[in-house]
C-alpha cells in the first residue's frame, strides 16, 4: 500500500488496484526545510498499470487573494473592462453575445461574424428591376476601389442618401447579387453600445473580416445601413456620445488608411486588402462634416425617376398578373409616394382574404390554429388585383397619411 503523509505540502495518493506494485511509488514529505525521500524498488519488471494522483482542492486559498480574478466579470466603471453592461442593454444596441466582443479575456480574432449576408436569389430570373443610374454608380465605385489607378486617390466610402422608403438598401442588395458579392452587413443599431469604444472596434472587425474574404479571392464589401441614424445628430433631442465620436473617427481613419486597419491591441505590418464601404442614409448633413468630404466619401443622391418607379413597381407586382398599363396608371396616380408605398399597397390587398379566414376559424381559436397546431399554417389563394381595387386601397393609405399629419395629437394639447 502506498503510504500517505499528512503534513504541510504533502501529496495524497490513491491506493493502486494491484497492491504488489505499492513499492514503486516513492514517499516524500517536506519536514521543515529538509526533504526526506525514501524509495525502494522491489522488482525490475515493466508495469503497465495506471494510477492517479489526487490533490486536495481549496479554491478560496487561490481565488480570493488573486487580484486578477474578476477581470472578465467585474462591473466597475473601469475602461479596461469591456464587459461592463453585458446583458443590461437591449441586444439591438450590442453586438451578438458570445462572439468575443463582450469578453475582455478573448482575442479579437475569435470574433465570429453574424453580419455576412448570403443572397440566394438571382435578380435576372426573379425579374427585379435595378435602376441603371444606381447600378452604374455602385459598380463604378466598387471597381475603382479594387483597381490600382496611377496617382488617383479614390474615395473608400460611397454614401447613398435620399428620401425614406425609396428602396436604397434593396437596390444595393440587387447590385451586390448581380455582381456576386456577399457583403458584410452592419446596421445603425450596432453603432451604439453600453461599452465605450465597442462600436468602433466592431467596425474594424467587420472591415478586417471583409478583407479576409477578399484575400481568399472573393469580392466583398462593408455595407452599413442607416448610418445617419446611428452616428448622426438629429436635433437637440439626440445625445451625442463618445461612441458617436469614435464611430466617425474610425470611419475617417479607415478611409485615410484603408490597407492598414488594425484591431485594438493587435498590431502588425502586414497590409490588408482594400474593402469598399457602402453606407445608406436619409440626411448626411447630420454626420460629422470631415467624414463626408469628397476625398473620403463619394455621395450619391437617389431619387427614382418615373421610369425607375414604373420598373420597380413592375417587379413588385410581377407575380400578380397586373397589366403594364395598370402599373403605369397606378404610378401616375400616386406620384408623390415612395416605392415602399406600393409594397404596402400590395400587402393591403390580402386583408380581405385574411379577414375571411379569421371569421371562418373564430377569433377565440386563432392562436390554436396559428402557433399551436399540428397542421400546417393556412394558405391563401392569390387574390385578383384589379386596378380599381389597387386605387381604392391606395386612396385609403393616402387618407391615413393625411390624417396623421392633420391631427397631431401631441402638439394640439
UniProtKB/Swiss-Prot annotation:
One of its GO terms (cellular component) is chloroplast stroma. The keyword Cell division does not apply. Its main location: plastid. Residues 1-54 form a transit peptide. Keywords: ATP-binding, Chloroplast, Nucleotide-binding, Plastid, Transit peptide. GO terms for molecular function: ATP binding; ATP hydrolysis activity. It is found in: Plastid, Chloroplast stroma. The keyword Nucleotide-binding applies. ATP binds at residues 162-169. Pfam families: AAA (PF00004), RuBisCO_activase_AAA_helical (PF21228). Belongs to the RuBisCO activase family. Activation of RuBisCO (ribulose-1,5-bisphosphate carboxylase/oxygenase; EC 4.1.1.39) involves the ATP-dependent carboxylation of the epsilon-amino group of lysine leading to a carbamate structure. This is Ribulose bisphosphate carboxylase/oxygenase activase, chloroplastic. The lineage of its organism: Eukaryota, Viridiplantae, Streptophyta, Embryophyta, Tracheophyta.
Amino acid at each position: 500500500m502506498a503510504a500517505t503523509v499528512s503534513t504541510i505540502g504533502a501529496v495524497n495518493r490513491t491506493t493502486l488496484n494491484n497492491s504488489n506494485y505499492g513499492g514503486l511509488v516513492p514517499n516524500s514529505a517536506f519536514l521543515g526545510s529538509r526533504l526526506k525521500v525514501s524509495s525502494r524498488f522491489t522488482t525490475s519488471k515493466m508495469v503497465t498499470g495506471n494510477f492517479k494522483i489526487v490533490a486536495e482542492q481549496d479554491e478560496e486559498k487561490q481565488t480570493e487573494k488573486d487580484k486578477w480574478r474578476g477581470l472578465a466579470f467585474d462591473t466597475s466603471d473601469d475602461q479596461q473592462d469591456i464587459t461592463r453592461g453585458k446583458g443590461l442593454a437591449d441586444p439591438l444596441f450590442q453586438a451578438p453575445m458570445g462572439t468575443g466582443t463582450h469578453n475582455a479575456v478573448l482575442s479579437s480574432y475569435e470574433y465570429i461574424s453574424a453580419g455576412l449576408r448570403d443572397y440566394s436569389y438571382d435578380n435576372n430570373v426573379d425579374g427585379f428591376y435595378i435602376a441603371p443610374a444606381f447600378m452604374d454608380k455602385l459598380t463604378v465605385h466598387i471597381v475603382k476601389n479594387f483597381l490600382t489607378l496611377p496617382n488617383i486617390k479614390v474615395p473608400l466610402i460611397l454614401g447613398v442618401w435620399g428620401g425614406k422608403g425609396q428602396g436604397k438598401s434593396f437596390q444595393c442588395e440587387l447590385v451586390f447579387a448581380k455582381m456576386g458579392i456577399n457583403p458584410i452587413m452592419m446596421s445603425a443599431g450596432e453603432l451604439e453600445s453600453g461599452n465605450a469604444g465597442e462600436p468602433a472596434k466592431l467596425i474594424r472587425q467587420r472591415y478586417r473580416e471583409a478583407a479576409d474574404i477578399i484575400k481568399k479571392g472573393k469580392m466583398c464589401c462593408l455595407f452599413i445601413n442607416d448610418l445617419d441614424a446611428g452616428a448622426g445628430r438629429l436635433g437637440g433631442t439626440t445625445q451625442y456620445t463618445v461612441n458617436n465620436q469614435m464611430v466617425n473617427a474610425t470611419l475617417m481613419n479607415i478611409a485615410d488608411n484603408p490597407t492598414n486597419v488594425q484591431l485594438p491591441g493587435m498590431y502588425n505590418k502586414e497590409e490588408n486588402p482594400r474593402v469598399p464601404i457602402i453606407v445608406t442614409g436619409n440626411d448626411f448633413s447630420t454626420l460629422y462634416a470631415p467624414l463626408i468630404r469628397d476625398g473620403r466619401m463619394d455621395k450619391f443622391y437617389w431619387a427614382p425617376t418615373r421610369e425607375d418607379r414604373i420598373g420597380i413597381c413592375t417587379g413588385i407586382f410581377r407575380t400578380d398578373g397586373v397589366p403594364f398599363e395598370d402599373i403605369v396608371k397606378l404610378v401616375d396616380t400616386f406620384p408623390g409616394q415612395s416605392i415602399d408605398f406600393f409594397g404596402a399597397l400590395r400587402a393591403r390587398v390580402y386583408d380581405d382574404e385574411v379577414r375571411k379566414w379569421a371569421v371562418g376559424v373564430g377569433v377565440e381559436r386563432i392562436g390554436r390554429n396559428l402557433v399551436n397546431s399540428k397542421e400546417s399554417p393556412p394558405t391563401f389563394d392569390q387574390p385578383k388585383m384589379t386596378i380599381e381595387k389597387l386605387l381604392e386601397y391606395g386612396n385609403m393609405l393616402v387618407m391615413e397619411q393625411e390624417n396623421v399629419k392633420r391631427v397631431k395629437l401631441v402638439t394640439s394639447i
